[in-house]
């Protein structure tokens, strides 16, 4: 039987309660005092008459405002809540004392190690989990959690061990043990895959920190709601396919199919049947399958003149004929095209139909190269590090202090895809818990070899010149990391270089990174 006594803060009140229980020969099993004015009593069951009499006498004690029965003592309630939480967790969880002996194990851990709760308490963590010195870690008086890759029964787990501190009598935090959680890398990978699959809400996958990329995303949001053909241009690896899919998801056609065809990856004779279908085989083409939705034609600059003519006809009235059939089919499809080529130059050289270019160029989205978006490089790096570490089931490495300087000054000729591949390669070969510049393979990059695309030629002559000048300074500053060395390399005064670096924010960027 448990009672909750509401009372005032009066000296001697608790003693009077205890004296009353002694007087009635009641066996007290436990007492807990809450600082906010509540006393909890736990004693054996009483007959109704004795219980009613006891309640009346407790209420007559000076300072007692009320008394009532409760199902649990506060400590019992907390213990039951914790037990329910641990039982509900799908991940194995262990509680360790300062000798790394197991004090508590949830059902998931009992199942993993094939032991009962009692048998688990007879083991230390090291007897069940190899590859980590638990005792040495506890003796080091850790303040933060630590992650470690471990193998248990042939399964890969990410082990996270967290120190448990309690406040001692002198108000200092004392280490009393640790909590170990084991997360299956297979389960984590599936969860990440499901999350990635579900988190396709339009532009949520696109990193946009710089003002220029924010403007591009905002422009894309507006263009996404329209039905006219959309032309997306940009260098290789800038994310044209990602923007195309985002535009579909942000459009009224989001619930309808989205299909993509790379015009450079399949032979010319196969492109026609892929897009328009093949009647003798009963095959539906992309346009028919995506009726009501969107179709991305990637690398549109690689499309043959004959297919350009057929595409132009389809764009004009939305009708086409399947290969081997005279019957016309009408569909409602938004066509999104992407290219890294300069279509204007191709038109001038007779390699691309002028009328098709103007039909596609109604709505245009130009994606800038990553070298023009230095503010986006580290957020992209952090995103890919987190993503690939989680997928591989390894702890996320810390990024070294000098990594930002190197990555933001590199030219990234392959743009976002280049960053993604470089980070993936680095993580698969990383030894240790810190990602450093030497861990990332960055081939020599010559800014002078970069092709001048349409996006580079935007704006006035001063804007184009400034953009190119900033790119040159950014690249050379990597190899000549002082204003005097850079000035000597370029044959100008130290003051002139200092002013230019300040103008483009390169000197401030270096200071902030240092």
From Swiss-Prot:
Q: Name one GO molecular function term.
A: DNA binding
Q: Where is the PAS domain?
A: 78-120
Keywords of this protein's UniProt record, alphabetized? Answer: Activator, Aromatic hydrocarbons catabolism, ATP-binding, Cytoplasm, DNA-binding, Nucleotide-binding, Repressor, Transcription, Transcription regulation
Source organism's superkingdom? Answer: Bacteria
Q: A single GO BP annotation from the record?
A: catabolic process
**Annotated DNA-binding ranges?**
482-502
Q: Where in the cell is it found?
A: Cytoplasm
Stretches assigned to the ACT domain: 2-72
Start and end of every Sigma-54 factor interaction domain? 206-428
Whether Nucleotide-binding counts among this entry's keywords is: yes
Query: SUPFAM superfamilies from the xrefs?
Result: ACT-like (SSF55021), Homeodomain-like (SSF46689), P-loop containing nucleoside triphosphate hydrolases (SSF52540), PYP-like sensor domain (PAS domain) (SSF55785)
Q: Which GO terms describe its cellular component?
A: cytoplasm
Q: List the disulfide bonds.
A: none
* Residue positions binding ATP: 234-241, 290-299
Job of this protein: Dual transcriptional regulator of the TyrR regulon, which includes a number of genes coding for proteins involved in the biosynthesis or transport of the three aromatic amino acids, phenylalanine, tyrosine and tryptophan. These three aromatic amino acids act as effectors which bind to the TyrR protein to form an active regulatory protein. Acts by binding specifically to TyrR boxes in the promoter region of the target genes.
Q: Subunit info? A: Homodimer. In presence of tyrosine (or high concentrations of phenylalanine or tryptophan) and ATP, it self-associates to form an hexamer.
Q: What is this protein called?
A: HTH-type transcriptional regulatory protein TyrR
The gene for this chain is tyrR
């Amino acid at each position: 039987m448990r009672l909750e006594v509401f009372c005032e803060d009066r000296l001697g009140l608790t003693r009077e309660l205890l004296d009353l229980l002694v007087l009635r020969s009641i066996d007290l099993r436990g007492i807990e005092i809450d600082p906010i004015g509540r006393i909890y009593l736990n004693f054996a069951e009483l007959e109704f008459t004795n219980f009613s009499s006891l309640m009346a006498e407790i209420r007559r004690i000076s300072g007692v405002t009320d008394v009532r029965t409760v199902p649990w003592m506060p400590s019992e309630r907390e213990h039951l809540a914790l037990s329910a939480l641990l039982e509900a967790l799908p991940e194995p969880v262990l509680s360790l004392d300062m000798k790394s002996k197991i004090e508590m194990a949830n059902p998931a851990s009992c199942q993993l190690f094939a032991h009962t709760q009692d048998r688990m308490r007879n083991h230390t963590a090291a007897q069940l989990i190899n590859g980590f010195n638990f005792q040495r870690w506890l003796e080091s008086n850790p303040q933060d959690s630590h992650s470690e890759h471990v193998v248990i029964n042939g399964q890969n787990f990410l082990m996270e061990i967290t120190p448990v501190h309690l406040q001692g009598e002198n108000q200092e935090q004392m280490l009393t043990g640790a909590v170990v959680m084991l997360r299956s890398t297979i389960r984590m990978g599936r969860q990440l895959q499901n999350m990635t699959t579900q988190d396709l809400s339009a532009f949520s996958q696109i990193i946009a920190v710089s003002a220029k990329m924010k403007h591009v995303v905002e422009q894309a949001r507006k263009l996404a709601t329209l039905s006219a053909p959309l032309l997306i241009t940009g260098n290789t690896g800038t994310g044209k396919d990602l923007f195309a899919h985002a535009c579909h998801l942000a459009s009224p056609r989001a619930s309808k199919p989205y299909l993509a065809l790379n015009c450079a990856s399949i032979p010319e004779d196969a492109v026609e049947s892929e897009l328009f279908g093949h009647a003798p085989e009963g095959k539906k083409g992309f346009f028919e399958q995506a009726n009501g939705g969107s179709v991305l034609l990637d690398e549109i600059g690689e499309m043959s003149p004959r297919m350009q003519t057929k595409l132009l006809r389809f764009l004009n009235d939305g009708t086409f004929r399947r290969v081997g059939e005279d019957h016309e089919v009408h569909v409602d499809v938004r066509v999104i095209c992407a290219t890294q080529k300069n279509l204007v130059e191709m038109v001038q050289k007779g390699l691309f139909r002028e009328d098709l270019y103007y039909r596609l160029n109604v709505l245009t989205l130009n994606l800038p190269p990553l070298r023009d978006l230095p503010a986006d490089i580290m957020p992209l790096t952090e995103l890919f590090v987190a993503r690939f570490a989680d997928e591989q089931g390894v702890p996320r490495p810390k990024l070294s202090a000098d990594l930002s300087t190197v990555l933001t000054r590199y030219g990234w000729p392959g743009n976002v895809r280049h960053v993604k591949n470089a980070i993936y390669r680095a993580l698969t070969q990383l030894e240790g818990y810190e990602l450093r510049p030497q861990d990332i393979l960055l081939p020599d990059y010559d800014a002078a070899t970069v092709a001048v695309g349409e996006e580079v030629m935007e704006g006035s002559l001063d804007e184009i010149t400034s953009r190119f000048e900033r790119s040159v300074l950014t690249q050379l500053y990597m190899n000549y990391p002082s204003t005097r060395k850079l000035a000597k390399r370029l044959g100008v005064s130290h003051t002139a270089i200092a002013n230019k670096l300040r103008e483009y924010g390169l000197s401030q960027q270096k200071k902030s990174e240092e």
